[in-house]
Amino acid sequence: MISYQTEGVKMPAIKRRETTAWIKSVAATYGKKVGDIAYIFCDDEKILEVNREYLQHDYYTDIITFDYCEGDIISGDLFISLDTVRSNSEMVGATYEQELHRVIIHGILHLCGINDKGEGEREIMEACENKALAMR
């Protein structure tokens, strides 16, 4: 089950049924099934608080993914800062909606085993994001 929640922000205008179906399709391309996934949309201050408390990182970010996957079942809590999504969309010349969908699927790709911190991994992640976005 995929749930969409907010903490301190208004729920973004996403089509939940379509988004859920899209997420399941993307996961299936990696041989994964969707378990329990919670999207928590929040502001910059909340994501900074989560980043400090659980990851000991003292910076803002667009998404934090807590991975609870077991085998081929992907599960996790995904915190998304709508403030950072908005500023990133302006920086990269994308619409807010485009950037939000990129970040939504970025977390799913992490749960599917795609990383973006090591040598060459950022490019692989971007290619996977683009492939997933084309499936929308």
Predicted regions and their residues:
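An acidic/histidine-cluster motif and surrounding catalytic segment
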Residues: M1-H101, C112-R136
